[in-house]
Amino acid sequence: MLRTSCTSSLRRVVGKYVVSPLVASQIRFATSSVRSQPYLLNSELTELPAQFKRYSSILLTEKPEGDVPESGPEPSGESGISEKSNVENDKHDGNDEIKPEAEKNEKDEIEKPEIDKDAIVETDGVSESSVENVSGSSSAAGGASAPPSGNSNNNNNNNNNNNDNDEPNEIVTNAGTGLYPPLLAIPMKDRPPLPGRPFAINITDPEVIRSIYTIIDKREPYFVLFHVKDPNEGDTDVINSKDSVYNIGVHCQIIRHTTPRPGVFNVLGYPLERCSLADLSTPSEKKGETETRKEGENFPTSYLKGLKVSYATVKPVKDEPFDKTSTDIKSLVESLKALLSKMGAKNPLEKLQIKEGTELVNDPPRFADFVGSTIHGDPKKIQEILESLNIQTRLSKALELLKVELKASLIKENTIHNLSTKADEYQTRLFIKEFIKELQKRAGIVESDDKKTSKFDERLKHLKMTEEALEAYNAEKAKMESQNEHSSELGVSERYLDWLTSIPWGIYSKDRFNIKQAREILDRDHYGLKDVKDRILEFISMGRVSGKVDGKILCLTGPPGTGKTSIAKSIAESLNRKYVRIAMGGIQDVHEVKGHRRTYVGSIPGRIISALKQAKTSNPLMLIDEIDKLDLSRSGGASSAFLEILDPEQNNAFVDNYIDVKVDLSKVLFVCTANYLGNISPPLRDRMEIIEVNGYTNNEKIEIAKRHLIPDAAKKAGLEGGHVVIETKTISRLIEKYCRESGLRNIKKLITRIFSKASLKIVEEVEAREGESKSKSEEAKSEAITGSVTEISVEDATVKAQSIEEPSVESASQKVDEAKPVESEELKSDEEEEEVVKLEIPDDIKLEITSANLKDYVGPEIYTRDRVYDIPPPGVATGLSYSTSGNGDALYIESILTHSIGSGSGHASIHVTGSLKDVMKESASIAYSFAKSYMVKNYPENRFFEAAEIHVHCPDGAIPKDGPSAGISFTSSLISLALQKPLPPTIAMTGEITVTGRVLAVGGLREKILGAKRYGCNTIIFPKDIENELEEIPEEVKEGVKFIPVEWYQDVFDEIFPNLSSDEGNEVWKEEFNKLDKKKASNKKK
């Protein structure tokens, strides 16, 4: 095309001359104008346009290459060409490849110009006088790289024909202030442009569009562009304040403008240079002070005053001087060039553009701007490059952004590559699998059924599934075989068939009903617990008689550490049944018991089906451990699920939500354990057969420690040879002073601690002996060496020395080589874990643990006193308590007068403390009421309760207390205070009191007896209603204790206050009340 040939010809001409920067910029503008003018596409055009003729004549006035004119005098300010013009021209030289963005896709109509290196004109060494000598030259926008264009009568768009007078008018800086006249100011939210690279911006404000048409008509197509600080501000084409934009912007020239759609005006601009904002006029200011201030002023762009746009007075910004030979700058330029080459190699679309940019390496400022314009960085980071006047800083910031972009490009490329590789591998594997499968089918190597279902068919041969389960199996198997191998539902079906065939359908272990063997197993594993063992043997004997053991639900309840779980294991061993355990702690949802439906991702069966799979039989002993830990307030659904599981009438058709077929649990022997029955819901408790496992007595604890705990601890510590001896008295003291609870866990811990400390002492003793023996052997060896020294003559020594051959080099090296494997073996043995050899303990080393040295092993005693009061004062009664952990203890009730009756207020009151809960507070209130009525009835002259201010306290205030069993203790304490008679310290009592004086039954008599004996009480008053429980309490527990059953409180009174006459009880508080009566009489007179 003619257009391309024109530009190419002009380039060839330029290559033969060294021209001034201004002329070079004019030539570049001419070539770009030719490429951008559509009328040049006319095939009838036969001569060069006027621009080419004019600039060709300018070229002829230049001197040929090598004859560079000398520097002339400095140009004056009136010429319109300042020092800034030359610097900026030099800075922007070579940017002739300005191609409007709107023409990038016009491949069919406009040919892409070739990049000609000759078009980049070197301007180094060109003096300012050479610019002065160019006739008719002018500096557009103060020396910017793009030259002015000719006049246009109506330049509304770029499709109007240009003529020879289309040059832009000259706009220069003021010689005094260095400022440009006011120019149109436009804000930009997108990334700010950098000098040397064209950009496009869309304008929607009608006033701004009108002003652009105006400056084009005036042949002054210049404006300034500033980046906004906050991109979230309203979408506007007017700058409303200086604070809303950055201070450094760009001075631009309009290259082309189009209207892509109604209401949108697209401007292709070319950034000429950096500029700083000196003053800003906004549409709002023009009506006020600013307009008044500028009235009468006359400047080249004064026509902008009448438009509702923002215009600014700007000052060109110069780069800081720099040294091109600086090592730092060269290093930065080379780094940028290398990274750009990498980017070009990875992105062929940008390869040509990057190649053009790398040719600017000799001009670091323009090279930095090129890199900043090329990369897609954060607009704020680009603005930092724009504001960087220090060339080294500008290069550093550009390098930093380029590294980030390259890293992101690498990550993106690797991600795409990995995804593509995985997809290719998947397709390859899929093809190979399908190919092999087809070959196997044709060769008849495999059956048509899927291999994955064959393992389930193999399991099915050994199972006796119900019809419902078999139907579900076949349906799921058919579904699985019909699914694609890569379907997500395939895994769901496979897991379901796996669980369904893992249930032991029809598999039962043979029960063993041997009473003798069962008794031996129970006695072997447990000492005492006669009642529990008898109940279990009765249960087994029923199975022996009937020939089967139906699914029973046993519940072993008792304090912690009494062996409930181990009893369940012994029952399973006695019956020859598999043992599985389900812990109830933490179960808060019914789905954990009955499973989740298969609609949920990752659903599994519940605990019951999982336990059957683990047992591999349909009649295991299934231990529901700590069923009282089931939180009824949060997991009522789980408790309701156990109503079905533990009901023999319903559990033959248990349905798990995941399996969704009926499973027979009627042959399962359920054994539950609980610490406190009160935490189990009544409907669930009704389905169980309760077996109470009471706490151990001291004698039982001693025997269990001797038979089980001490041998186990000695075995774990490696001291089985009788090296540690614990006396029976020591065990008894350990129980009395350290662990009074009903269970065995604490005493087990203490015995383990004894053996651990004993092992330390034994090892220290053995090592001390080994050290002594070693030192003795060394002394003996040294003495032997000293005693065996013989005299050797000089001649013999010389002969012996000569007989020793000096080793050769070969032999020495051979020895070194032979030693190397030894070194490696030594290193290898060091790295490997050394096997610990058991210490051989001499038989004479023995440790005796006695009552005297017991505290050296387990620390100081915890329970130092057996009773609080040796001789209790009046108002102190000894009650008995029983905790849910199975421990019996003494409970003291203390009552005092807060004021003497004579000096008090005369009003009766009672105050109760000691962390008492509601039931116990009511019991104290009932006791107070009954005590008053009892004193009025039996000691009418004792007016104690008419004016007594009483404080009742129960010690151990940190421990919450509840229950009615302290009723007679409260009453006895109050009556003791009223009669001023102390109670015997050896008498303890328990029982609920009513307002009529009736004593009602309470629980935990066995544990309370043990607690009373520990505190030295040999007489126990208890309700007559529970007298029959004494028959079930072992004799060793009742030994040394006098039991007094009572039905009314009068029986209690007769026991604690024998031989108390009426006169003695009536005379107690007479003097105090006489004082009180006199005090009241005197108060009335006043």
From Swiss-Prot:
Residue span of the annotated presequence: 1-55
Residue numbers annotated as active site: 965, 1008
Listed GO CC annotations: mitochondrial matrix
EC number: 3.4.21.53
Residues reported to bind ATP: 558-565
UniProt region (Disordered), positions on chain: 61-176, 767-788, 800-835
Protein name per UniProt: Lon protease homolog, mitochondrial
Species for this entry: Scheffersomyces stipitis (strain ATCC 58785 / CBS 6054 / NBRC 10063 / NRRL Y-11545) (Yeast)
Name of encoding gene: PIM1
